[in-house]
Structure formats: C-alpha cells, structure tokens
Amino acid sequence: MGSNFHYTIDLNEDQNHQPFFASLGSSLHHHLQQQQQQQQHFHHQASSNPSSLMSPSLSYFPFLINSRQDQVYVGYNNNTFHDVLDTHISQPLETKNFVSDGGSSSSDQMVPKKETRLKLTIKKKDNHQDQTDLPQSPIKDMTGTNSLKWISSKVRLMKKKKAIITTSDSSKQHTNNDQSSNLSNSERQNGYNNDCVIRICSDCNTTKTPLWRSGPRGPKSLCNACGIRQRKARRAAMATATATAVSGVSPPVMKKKMQNKNKISNGVYKILSPLPLKVNTCKRMITLEETALAEDLETQSNSTMLSSSDNIYFDDLALLLSKSSAYQQVFPQDEKEAAILLMALSHGMVHG
C-alpha cells in the first residue's frame, strides 16, 4: 500500500517564479532515503536483467511555483509529477521524467513495490492580510482602511475649503447683484419721477425745450431760448456797468490832461517838454557865440586903441624928455636911450 504525505507551505514573497527544491524536513528525507534504496535495488535488477526497466531517480525535483496563484497542489509519486492548479491557470506545469541509460519509462510498465505519495499544499496569503502587516503608506497603498480614512479626511478638508470659497463668492455675487438691482431700481424710480415732473419756463411758460437752463428762479427754470436771451442781456448789462465805471473815472483824468496842455502853451512847463529844451539850448549856444565874438572884437579894438595911445604917449614922452634940459644934464645920451628902450619894452612897443 502507498503512503501519502501532506505538507503546507506559505508563500509571502512577490517573485513571479522561484525554483524550489523539495527537501522538506527530516521525515521527508527519511522517506526519500527509503526510495533511493528501492531505486538501487531496481538498478541491480536492471544490470542483471537488461530487459527490465528502471525506475526514475526522484530524490530532489526542481519545479517552478507561481506566487501569484492562491494555492498550488503538487501530487508526487515515483512515476509521475503533476501540478494541479486552480481553474484559472491556463497551462499546468509538467515535469520531465528522468530515465536512466537509454531506457523508456511509462506508468503502465513500471510496477514499484511500495508506492509513496507526497502532497504539497502551497498557500499564499491575501493581499489584504499582507498589507495589514506592512506599514501603510497613504500614497502607494490605496486599499488600507486607515489610508482611506486619512485621504478622505484630506479630501473632506479640501472640499470644505472649496465649499466655503464658493459660498463666499456666491454671497458676494448675491450682494453685488442686490446692490446693482437696488441702484437700477432707484435710478428707474428717479428717472420716472423726473420724467413725471412737468417743467414750465418762468419767462415764456413753455413746457417743451431741448435743454433747460438756470435762471433767476433757480436751476432749470428757463427754456433754452429764454436762457440764451437772458444771458445776452446780462452780458450787455455788465458791459454798460463797466462803461459807466470807466466814464466816472475818466473826467478828472481828462481835466488833468487839459491843464497840462494849457500850462505848456502858457510857457510854464516848456522846460519839461523835450523839443523846447533843444530849441533853448540852440538859442543859448548862438547867443554865447555872439557874445564871445563881440568880446573878441572889443578886446581887439581896445588893444589897438591902447597900442595907439601907448605909441602916442611914448612919442610924447620922448619929445618931452628930449626937450627938457634938466634931464639932459642929469642923464647922458646913452642912458637916455636905454631908458627909452626900457619904457618901450615895458609898454610892449618893441617886438623882438
């Protein structure tokens, strides 16, 4: 009878395919040693009888395990090695039978004495359990409850902020709309009231005009024509007022001007005018020149008269001295001539 062994292996690694060598403890090793002894016995039989077939050496079987699958069941006996997987596995794993020198093996031809079966059950924990053991990161792991709560709190805060901003903006818009509506309503009411007021010109009593002007009764109390007419009248009145003011100031000025003219005509203020000054200066220069000429003539006449008189006087003096006997006795002839010359020199009669 055959013996079955069941082993369970947990896989917690993320590798896709891993080579696994089935050395599963002391008990498994003990059974494998028994199987090796049986295989050696078959080898001796094959050497003695070459027609007999030899069993495969199945001490350690390398096989591949897909860690992505949930459970892997491995069926083991001394003839075949099959992998029984779940229904979602498309292609089952098959192991090769190792045959000795040139022999062919089949399950029908081999008849072992003892049949041993080894059943391996490989289980992999769920992602949820693995992720709960590991530290949770809110960005990479999106399946954890704590991370979901943390992210949801952030999202809630952001949503609250957005909601507050939107509510504030909406309230501001509502207030602006209310203010604009109130202003428009007030403007409409004021315009309606202004339109309803019937204006009458205080001058011509008209009610239709393109433009209302200010008048003596206040703003917009005159029509356009009356306002222009009254404005012209005001300007004319202002011009006449300025003219009368100028006329009230002008008579004394004119009187002063006439008096000045009269004074100039009378000769009192002739010196002030520039033309009489020039004439007077010319006249004075002429008179001065005339007086200078007259004086020169007088001096010349006087000098001639004096010279003639001196000459006459000198001649008379010479005659008198020549005739006097006393003068002749006192002064000799040389001295007489010298005295006459000195007298002549003193009177300027002799010119050298």
Curated annotation (Swiss-Prot):
Record's protein name: Putative GATA transcription factor 22
Classification via Gene3D superfamilies: Erythroid Transcription Factor GATA-1, subunit A
Gene: GATA22
Keyword Metal-binding: yes
Biased composition (Polar residues): 165-189
CDD domains to which the protein is assigned, alphabetical: ZnF_GATA (cd00202)
Residue stretches of biased makeup (Low complexity): 33-53
Lineage, broadest ranks: Eukaryota, Viridiplantae, Streptophyta, Embryophyta, Tracheophyta
Species annotation: Arabidopsis thaliana
Nuclear localization signal, short sequence motif: residues: 112-119
GO biological process, any: plant organ senescence
GO cellular component, one term: nucleus
Residue ranges, annotated region (Disordered): 27-53, 163-189
Tissue specificity remark: Expressed predominantly in leaves, and barely in stems, flowers and siliques.
Function per UniProt: Transcriptional regulator that specifically binds 5'-GATA-3' or 5'-GAT-3' motifs within gene promoters. Involved in the modulation of chloroplast development, growth and division in a cytokinin-dependent manner. Repressor of the gibberellic acid (GA) signaling pathway that regulates flowering and modulates greening, in a SOC1-dependent manner. Prevents the accumulation of SOC1 during flowering. Promotes chlorophyll biosynthesis throughout the plant, by regulating chlorophyll biosynthetic genes (e.g. HEMA1 and GUN4) and chloroplast localized glutamate synthase (e.g. GLU1).
GO MF annotations, alphabetized: DNA-binding transcription factor activity; transcription cis-regulatory region binding; zinc ion binding
Protein keywords: Cytokinin signaling pathway, DNA-binding, Gibberellin signaling pathway, Metal-binding, Nucleus, Transcription, Transcription regulation, Zinc, Zinc-finger
SUPFAM superfamilies xref list: Glucocorticoid receptor-like (DNA-binding domain)
Chief place where the protein resides: nucleus
Span of zinc fingers (GATA-type): 195-249
Induction: By light (including both red and white lights). Levels follow a circadian and diurnal rhythm, with a peak at 20 hours, thus preempting dawn. Activated by gibberellic acid (GA). Induced by cytokinin and derivatives (e.g. benzyladenine, t-Zeatin and 6-benzylaminopurine) in light conditions. Triggered by nitrate. Negatively regulated by AP3/PI. Strong accumulation during cold imbibition of nondormant seeds, but not at warm temperatures. Regulated by PIF transcription factors. Repressed by HAN. Inhibited by SOC1. Down-regulated by auxin (2,4D) and auxin response factors (e.g. ARF2 and ARF7).
Subunit field text: Forms heterodimers with GATA18.
Family from the record: Belongs to the type IV zinc-finger family. Class B subfamily.
PROSITE patterns xref list: GATA_ZN_FINGER_1 (PS00344), GATA_ZN_FINGER_2 (PS50114)
Superkingdom of origin: Eukaryota
Keyword RNA-binding annotated: no
